[in-house]
């Protein structure tokens, strides 16, 4: 899988791939990372990439010319590239999107800055547009990394243990059950006794009950999906 980050600030992105799981995936050639700076495509004397908003409004907007030329260059290099824009004015990114996108060969993330990107760029080049939540960031780079990370861990070989994927939150309607480590007793608090007895059937039952409790508290709408699924399966 190749990821291309179309960004004015590639240093914000590069550091994320210097350690841990994604670094190992790059070393194993499961992932490759590239960067494209719209400034390099600006036809203005001072490599300007933004301008005031037409129709009024605060702040500057990324203007179309540098992005048109940058994305044309990207598509000329690889016509199968899947271009994703990040903006809070979009559908929310979900786990199912991560699994689906993991089957792609090349994804490009276009990160906005200032007050956003000229809408004509999005209309012309976007294969998909995502939001990662109902809040505002100073730029799209963090949102791009969130999606890149989520997609990457669904690519075969990136995670050391493929079983990790099947038991995570959002693989089913329920949130994942709580996890515990050693020591068994710490700060006068013990790991649940059923976890210690080795009865895997009872452990599974307890984990299911804990998952349902956690889901009811944090994400009650997910619990409704779980209840509906169980009724349908009957």
Please name every model-derived segment.
Residues 2-40:
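Glycine-rich, flexible N-terminal cofactor/catalytic loop recognition
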Residues 49-70:
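Short, structured active-site "lid" loops
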Residues 183-234:
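SAM-dependent methyltransferases
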Residues 121-163, 168:
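Structured adenosyl-cofactor binding patch, chiefly the S-adenosyl-L-methionine
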Residues 142, 154-193:
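Internal, active-site/partner-interface "lid" segment
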Residues 63-113, 119:
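S-adenosyl-L-methionine/SAH cofactor-binding core of RNA-modifying enzymes
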């Amino acid at each position: 899988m190749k990821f291309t980050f179309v960004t004015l600030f590639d240093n914000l992105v590069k550091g994320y791939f210097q350690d841990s799981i994604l670094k190992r995936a790059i070393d194993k050639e499961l992932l490759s990372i590239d960067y494209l700076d719209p400034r390099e495509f600006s036809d203005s004397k001072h490599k300007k990439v933004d301008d005031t908003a037409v129709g009024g409004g605060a702040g500057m907007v990324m203007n179309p010319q540098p992005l048109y030329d940058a994305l044309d260059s990207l598509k000329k290099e690889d016509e199968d590239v899947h271009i994703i824009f990040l903006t809070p004015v979009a559908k929310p990114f979900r786990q199912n999107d991560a699994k689906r996108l993991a089957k792609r060969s090349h994804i490009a993330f276009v990160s906005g800055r200032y007050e956003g990107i000229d809408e004509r760029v999005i209309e012309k080049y976007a294969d998909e547009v995502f939001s990662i939540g109902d809040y505002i960031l100073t730029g799209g780079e963090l949102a791009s990394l969130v999606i890149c990370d989520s997609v990457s861990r669904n690519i075969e070989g990136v995670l050391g243990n493929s079983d990790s994927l099947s038991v995570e939150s959002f693989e089913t309607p329920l949130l994942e059950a709580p996890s515990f480590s050693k020591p068994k007793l710490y700060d006068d608090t013990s790991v649940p006794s059923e976890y210690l007895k080795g009865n895997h059937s009872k452990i599974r039952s307890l984990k299911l009950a804990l998952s349902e409790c956690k889901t009811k508290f944090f994400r009650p709408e997910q619990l409704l999906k779980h209840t509906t699924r169980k009724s349908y399966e009957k």
